Every structure is written in structure tokens, then in C-alpha cells.
């Protein structure tokens, strides 16, 4: 592996993310209880007064709050519309997130497009440059159709909740880059 690739991998592992996982067939209270048990803290409580969205929260051993909020876009009874909202995560937290999702699934949670569920990943801006953000947008845009097909994403949900990268946005970023280089 060359030095540039090694540096890029190291930087990727420091990338912060926030993840939202939509599910139903589990109450927010039960989901928070499952999370608290998985984290080994046993700490979960109704935090709707502070967080809104009929939220229940669980805390991990690091004191981070993992929220389970109501999301009206999810199909099913209101008490079972549940969206996991993670604290800020890094590469080292991916296994924790994966296992928590498994624990929730074993507790009855369901998450697929037919239930109006999806996953949102928010990428932290720290450490990015205009060029790296352009690269990220271009990589995502070039793979969106493959991801949508592989995950069998519902086209109506894609047009409403998870739109693809707008080609005009990419053109504007490319134009800004060209103009910036000429200056």
C-alpha cells in the first residue's frame, strides 16, 4: 500500500458520522431498554420533554446518548414508529452500531422499504476540503443507482425522502473548481 492510500485510510477511520435507522414493530421505550441492556448500563428514560418527538434515550458506557424518536414517515401504529438516532460515531463504533441493530431486530424491530423505513448517514465536515467534498459527492453520485438497485429502494420514497445528488450541484462544483484554478 502506498503512502497516500495509507493516509487516506487513516483519515477515513477518523471520519465522524451520525446514523439514523428507521424501524417499526418495536416501541421506542422497548428499543431504548434493549439498547441500555446491550450497552451494559441499564440506563434508559423518556426524554421527550428535552428532545421532543416522543423520544426515549439510552446511554452507553461512554455516557453518549442514543435516541429512539418518533418518525411519522414510518408505516404502522404511532407507538411503533421508531428511529434510532446515534450520537456522533467514528469507525471504531461501527461494530457497536451493527450489534445494536442485531439486538433490536432480535427484539422484534423490522426495517425495510415496505415499512417506510430507511437509513440516513450524516458525514462530519471536520477535516474536509472543498476538493474532498467534491470527491465525496462525485463518488456518491456515481454509485447511487447501484446502491438503489442493490437495496431495492422504493422509487417514490427516493423522490420524496432520499433524493439523489442533483446533477446541477455537481456541475456547479466542477465549474467552481475550474474558475478557482484559473484565478
Task: Please identify what each model-predicted range represents.
Residues 112-128:
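Histidine-centered divalent-metal-coordination microenvironment in nucleic-acid enzymes
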Residues 1-107:
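Terminal catalytic/cofactor-binding subdomain
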Amino acid at each position: 500500500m502506498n503512502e497516500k492510500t495509507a493516509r487516506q485510510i487513516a483519515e477515513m477511520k477518523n471520519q465522524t458520522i451520525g446514523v439514523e435507522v428507521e424501524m417499526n414493530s418495536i416501541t421506542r421505550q422497548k428499543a431504548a431498554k434493549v439498547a441500555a441492556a446491550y450497552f451494559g448500563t441499564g440506563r434508559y428514560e423518556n426524554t421527550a420533554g428535552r428532545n421532543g418527538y416522543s423520544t426515549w434515550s439510552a446511554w452507553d458506557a461512554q455516557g453518549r446518548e442514543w435516541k429512539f424518536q418518533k418518525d411519522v414517515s414510518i408505516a404502522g401504529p404511532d407507538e411503533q414508529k421508531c428511529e434510532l438516532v446515534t450520537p456522533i460515531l467514528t469507525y471504531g463504533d461501527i461494530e457497536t452500531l451493527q450489534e445494536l441493530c442485531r439486538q433490536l431486530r432480535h427484539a422484534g424491530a423490522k426495517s425495510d422499504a415496505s415499512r417506510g423505513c430507511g437509513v440516513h448517514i450524516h458525514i462530519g465536515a471536520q477535516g474536509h476540503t472543498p476538493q474532498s467534498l467534491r470527491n465525496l459527492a462525485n463518488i456518491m453520485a456515481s454509485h447511487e443507482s447501484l446502491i438503489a438497485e442493490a437495496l431495492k429502494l422504493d422509487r417514490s420514497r427516493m423522490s420524496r425522502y432520499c433524493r439523489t445528488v442533483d446533477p446541477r450541484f455537481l456541475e456547479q462544483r466542477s465549474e467552481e473548481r475550474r474558475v478557482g484554478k484559473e484565478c
